[in-house]
């Protein structure tokens, strides 16, 4: 996004809703160092956090840094969100690996013939710019891809005498497959034997990722290191926000920068969004009033989205969210049950499970909270006005 400021086309210094580059990457020094160490030692890593906390940007930063430091790594990145079963996963797995280890159409054709000839690979150039994609001549429905395709990273690592790091986003999707547990066993059995390969697995649904990697009855239990991303601290946000304002000839005090970050509970996505909105409304110096008006505009913008979310819930689920937003803690007390019309005390467990499955709430010990801080604020300030 760009604005005209003093007749100069100026780039907005805050980014959200996409994987950010080096200039927009905020702190995460410890997490980046840890992930780089895991890459160097080929330690499998699962990254777990709520949605929009910067997992993809962290992986991108680590991959970029490692690639600059050494040319002995092949990085493969894939997103399996659209995969509905194991066959689609296998196809995506093979396509992603072939595409990302090949620098040209000729190179891709050569690699495909060498490594996946049984799938009858076809290469097509999709536009005048020379972008190309790979497809398979076999019909995976009538001629299923064999699970041995999972050994492809190690095969390539051995042939090319390099280390391979496979980064899989939205990994929790495999938990939705039919016979999900059986498929997870297949993945674990193949991947744990690969000595020159590491896997970085991350996803946007925290509770599902926890069930895959944190349950000792599941195949991926102790598959590798588990990284829980913490929130970026207010102090680090202040450094970033003040610096970005200053770099574009505007100013914001540390107090106001802290107020901005804490207004959205230091949530990475929303801090960037609120900082951008505040920057756009600032001529010279950003104030708390500017931050407040910017936050109001974000609430207005998201109003319909939040209404649609509430429309998918039962009355008691909506009531329970309102109770959480109001700061209630003793959910099974007669007073709270009556005030919010939550039904019986036994119903609270059912409500928690349902809303957690929808990724609307999170639970830490005895604390129950709404994952999305702006949604929580909307519930407190606007929902009851509808």
Predicted regions and their residues:
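Conserved Walker B catalytic segment
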Residues: 135-205, 214
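Amphipathic alpha-helical "lid/sensor" segments that cap RecA-like P-loop NTPase cores
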Residues: 238, 242-304, 365
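Short regulatory helix/loop adjacent to the ATP-binding pocket of P-loop NTPases
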Residues: 206-224
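Alpha-helical DNA-recognition elements
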Residues: 65, 277, 354
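P-loop NTPase nucleotide-binding core
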Residues: 49-53, 57-165, 346
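A short, basic N-terminal segment
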Residues: 1-50, 68
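C-terminal leucine-rich, beta-strand-based interaction scaffolds used for sensing/assembly
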Residues: 2-14, 300, 304-386
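Conserved AAA+ ATPase "SRH/arginine-finger" region at the nucleotide-binding site
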Residues: 225-235
């Amino acid at each position: 996004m760009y604005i005209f400021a003093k007749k100069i086309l100026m780039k907005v210094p805050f980014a959200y809703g996409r994987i950010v580059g080096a200039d927009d990457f905020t702190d995460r020094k410890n997490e980046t160092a840890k992930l780089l160490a895991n890459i160097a030692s080929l330690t499998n890593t699962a990254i777990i956090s709520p949605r929009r906390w910067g997992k993809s940007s962290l992986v991108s930063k680590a991959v970029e840094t490692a690639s600059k430091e050494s040319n002995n790594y092949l990085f493969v990145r894939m997103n399996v969100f659209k995969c509905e079963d194991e066959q689609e996963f296998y196809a995506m797995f093979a396509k992603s690996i072939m595409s990302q280890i090949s620098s040209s159409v000729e190179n891709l054709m050569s690699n495909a013939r060498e490594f996946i000839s049984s799938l009858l690979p076809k290469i097509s150039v999709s536009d005048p710019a020379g972008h190309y994609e790979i497809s398979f001549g076999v019909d995976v429905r009538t001629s299923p891809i064999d699970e041995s395709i999972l050994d492809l990273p190690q095969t390539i690592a051995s042939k090319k005498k390099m280390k391979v790091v496979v980064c899989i986003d939205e990994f929790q999707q495999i938990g939705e497959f039919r016979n999900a547990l059986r498929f997870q066993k297949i993945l674990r059995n193949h991947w744990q034997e690969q000595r020159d390969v590491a896997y970085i697995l991350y996803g946007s649904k925290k509770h599902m990722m926890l069930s895959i990697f944190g349950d000792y009855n599941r195949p991926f239990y102790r598959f590798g290191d588990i990284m829980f991303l913490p929130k970026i601290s207010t102090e680090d946000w202040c450094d970033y926000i003040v610096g970005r304002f200053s770099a574009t000839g505007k100013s914001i005090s540390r107090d106001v920068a802290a107020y901005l970050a804490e207004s959205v509970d230091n949530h990475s996505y929303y801090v960037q969004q609120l900082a951008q909105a505040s920057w756009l409304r600032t001529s010279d110096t950003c104030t708390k009033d500017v931050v407040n008006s910017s936050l109001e505009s974000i609430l207005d913008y998201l109003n319909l989205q939040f209404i649609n979310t509430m429309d998918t819930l039962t009355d008691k689920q909506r009531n329970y969210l309102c109770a959480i937003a109001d700061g209630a803690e003793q959910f099974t007390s007669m007073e709270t049950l009556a005030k919010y019309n939550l039904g019986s005390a036994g119903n609270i467990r059912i409500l928690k499970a349902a809303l957690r499955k929808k990724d609307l709430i999170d639970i830490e010990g005895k604390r129950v909270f709404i994952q999305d801080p702006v949604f929580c604020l909307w519930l407190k300030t606007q929902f009851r006005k509808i």
